Amino acid sequence: MSRRSSRLQAKQQPQASQTDSPQEAQIIQAKKRKTAQDVKKRKEEVTKKHQYEIRNCWPPVLSGGISPCIIIETPHKEIGTSDFSRFTNYRFKNLFINPSPLPDLSWGCSQDVWLNMLKKETRYVHDKHFEVLHSELEPQMRSILLDWLLEVCEVYTLHRETFYLAQDFFDRFMLTQKDINKNMLQLIGITSLFIASKLEEIYAPKLQEFAYVTDGACSEEDILRMELAILKALKWELCPVTVISWLNLFLQVDALKDAPKVLLPQYSQEKFIQIAQLLDLCILAIDSLEFQYRILAAAALCHFTSIEVVKKASGLEWDNISECVDWMVPFVSVVKSTSPAKLKIFKKISMEDRHNIQTHTNYLAMLDEVNYVNTFRKEGQLSPVCNGGIMTPPKSTEKPPGKH
C-alpha cells in the first residue's frame, strides 16, 4: 500500500466512527454548550457591580458629632434601578470663568496656583445657618467669642492669618456637630486658635498659656481632647485660603509693577490695615458666612479703591461682588466714622511684618452701631452705594428716643 492511500484510510476512519455513533455526537455538543454557558456566567460575575455600605467604628466624640467609618461589602443587596426623574437639574460653577490675575511666577505655573486657590474655595465650606444645628446658641455668642479671640491674638502678637484660620476651623467644625452646649464655645474657640497657632506661628504660645487665658474655664487636658475632636471632624483639612490671604494677594497683584516680586509685599501697609479692620468687623457678623472669602475680600477692597482695581486684582466682575458690596455698606460707614486704624509697634516684630500682627479694638460696640445703621436701611432712610460716597449714620447721642 502506498503512503498516500494509508493517509486517506486514516482520515476516513474517524469520519466513519462519527457517523456510526450519533449519541456520542450529541454528548460532545452538549458539553460545548455547557462550557459556553459557564464562560458567560463567569463574565457576568466579574462585571457585576458590588454593593457597599458605611458602618461607624467608634461612638462620636461629641454629642451629634461624626465618627470614623469603614466601608463593608453587602452582596446580598440588590442594585435598584435609579429613577433620575425626581432629581433637580443644577448648574455647576466653572472655575475657568475668572481668568488668573496672577503674573508669571518663577517657581510655578500661575494658572495652576490660581485654580488651586479657587478649588479650595469650594472644598472648604462654611455656612451662616450652622446656628440651626445648635438650639442653645445665638448669633451674638459667636461674635463675642471671635472678639475675644481677636484680643488674645493681640496680647500674644499672633498674626492675622492665625486668627482667620481659627475662625475658619471654628465655623467649619460647628457645621459638623449638633446641639453643642453654649458652655463648650470657649473651649472650641481656644482650641481652634491653638491649632492655628501651631500651623502659622514660628514661636507659638505654649499649651498652658492657652489654658491660662480662659481663666480656669478650660484645662490643658480639655484643649488636647478637643483638638483631636476638631481634627477628626475637619478630616485634617487645615489649609483654607482665608479672607486675609485673599486681601493680601489682591493688594499685592494691584501693586506689582513691570518687574514683579510676588513674594515681597509691595503694597501700602496703611491701606492694608484699614481694609483689614473692616474685614475684622465684618467677620464678627454671622451673615458674613453667606459669602465666599474671596468675595468678602474683593468687596472690602472695592470700598477703599475702585471696581477697576478689583477687576485687575481678583478677576471678578461687578455682578460677582455687588451683593456683598451692598451688604458691607453699614460696616464701612461705621469704620469710616471712627478714627482710622494706625500701625502699632510690637516688640521683636520687624517693621516689615508689623501690619500682619492681629490687632483688636472695640469691635462689639462697632457691631452694635452696624445693627443700628441696618435698622435705618430697612426703613429706607439710608441708600445703599452712591457715587458720592457712603452716608454716615447719626451719632449715638443723636439717636431718636424710640430707637434706643
UniProtKB/Swiss-Prot annotation:
Keywords: Cell cycle, Cell division, Cyclin, Nucleus, Phosphoprotein
Chain positions with Phosphoserine modification: 21, 383
Gene that produces this protein: CCNE2
GO biological process, one term: homologous chromosome pairing at meiosis
Domain of life: Eukaryota
Residue positions where Phosphothreonine is found in the record: 392
Source species: Bos taurus (Bovine)
UniProt xrefs under PANTHER family: CYCLINS
Region described as Disordered: spans on this chain: 1-45
Species lineage: Eukaryota, Metazoa, Chordata, Craniata, Vertebrata
Compositional bias segments (type: Polar residues): 7-26
Described function: Essential for the control of the cell cycle at the late G1 and early S phase.
Subcellular location: Nucleus
Post-translational modification: Phosphorylation by CDK2 triggers its release from CDK2 and degradation via the ubiquitin proteasome pathway. Lactylated at Lys-348. Delactylated by SIRT3.
Protein name, entry field: G1/S-specific cyclin-E2
MF terms in GO: cyclin-dependent protein serine/threonine kinase regulator activity
Basic and acidic residues biased stretches: 35-45
Gene Ontology cellular component list: cyclin E1-CDK2 complex; cyclin E2-CDK2 complex; cytoplasm; microtubule organizing center; nucleus
InterPro entries noted in UniProt: Cyclin (IPR039361), Cyclin-like_dom (IPR013763), Cyclin-like_sf (IPR036915), Cyclin_A/B-like (IPR046965), Cyclin_C-dom (IPR004367), Cyclin_N (IPR006671), Cyclins_cyclin-box (IPR048258)
